[in-house]
Amino acid sequence: MGGYNVAVVGVTGMVGQMFINVLRERNFPVKNWKLLASARSADKKINIEGKDYAIEEAAPQAFEGIDFAFFSAGGDVSKELAPEAAKKGALVVDNSSAFRMDEDVPLVVPEVNPQAASNHKGLIANPNCSTIQMVVALQPLHREAGLKRVVVSTYQSVSGSGKEAVDELAEQSRAVLNNEEPTKKNIPYKGAKKNHQIAFNMVPHLDEFEEDDYTKEEMKMIRETRKIMGIPELPLTATTVRVPVFNGHSEALTVELNSPLSPQEAREAFSKEKGIVVMDDPSELLYPMPVLTEGRDEVYVGRIRYDRSVPYGLNLWVVADNIRKGAATNSVQIAELFIERQS
C-alpha cells in the first residue's frame, strides 16, 4: 500500500482537527496516522474514516518513521519537538510563529512563493493566518504593477484565539442578551493583565504590544509579508482588530502601486489565480463576507476600486477562512508541493 506516514501534533485543537479534515478532503495519500497531543489527551481516541486512533503524547520518539509532521500545538511545543521530528527524517510544517523569521526556515504560501519550499532543512513554517490571505491577494497586483506601499486593517474572528474564545463569544452573547455580566478570559489573549468583552464589541489588540505600540500580530504581518514576497523594504503598516465573528478573517487593503492598474485589470489578474475567488458586483450587493467563505479554501476578493488619494492605488476587501486557508489548508498545500515533485 502506497502513501505516507503522517503525524498531527496538537490534534485536539481547532487547527489540529482541521488538519485531519483537510488531509481527507484533498485525498492526501496517508498510509498511517500518528495523532499527538499533550499528556492529558493521551489514550483518548479520534475516529478517522470509521477507525479509532489513540492519541499519543507528543515526544521525540513518536516521530520515528514519520514522513510528514503537521504542528499546531503552540510555539513552545514546536521549539522543542519540531527539530527532533526533522532529525528523524520527517518534513515538518509548523503552524506556530516559532521559526517564521528564522533565515534558515522557508516561510511559504504556495500561491506566492512555492520555490522557497525547496530550500528547507526539514522544517517549513506556515505564516500567520492574516498574512496568508493578504499575500495571496497582493501577489497578482505586485506582478502586474509593482507594490509601492500597503496599508491593511484586519477584522479577525475569535477562532483565531482558539476554541475557548469561540465558546466565550457564544456565552458572552447569551449573557449580555440576558442582562448578565459576561465572563472575560480570552480577549485580547489568555493571561493578559486585563481581559475585554468581545460580544457586541471590537478590540483593537491582538497579542502583546511591542515597540512603537504595534502589537505582535501587526508586526507579524509586516515582517512575514516582506519575507514571503521577497521585498525586505516594502512600506507596510497594519492595524489588527478582533471582532465578534466566530470564523473568518476580513481585511481592508489599501495598495499603492508603481504603475497604473485599473479595477477591471485587477479583477482579471485575480481571476487567473486558482486560489482566489473574485466576488465583486456592487450593483448586486455582492462582496465577500465571512459567512460566505467559511469552509472554503480560497481567498475571496471584492470591493475593488480606485484609491483616489494617490496616483496609482487600489482599495480592496479580502476574506478567508482562517482555520482552513489561514492554517490547515496552507500547511497541507505545502506538503503537496513535495508530493507533486515526486510524482
Regions found by a protein language model. Give the residues of each.
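N-terminal Rossmann-like NAD(P) cofactor-binding subdomain of oxidoreductases
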Residues: 1-198, 234-235, 263, 293, ...
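Generic solvent-exposed, charged/amphipathic alpha-helical segments
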Residues: 20, 222-226, 267, 271
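Glycine-rich beta-alpha junction loops
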Residues: 39-41, 129-130, 154-161, 202-210, ...
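Helix-loop-beta segment of a Rossmann-like dinucleotide-binding subdomain
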Residues: 118-125, 201-212, 316-318
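A glycine-rich, Thr/Ser-enriched phosphate-binding loop motif common to dinucleotide/cofactor-binding enzymes
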Residues: 122-133, 213-222, 326-330
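Oxyanion-binding "anion nests"
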Residues: 193-245
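C-terminal active-site/capping subdomain that shapes the small-molecule cofactor and substrate pocket
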Residues: 233-343
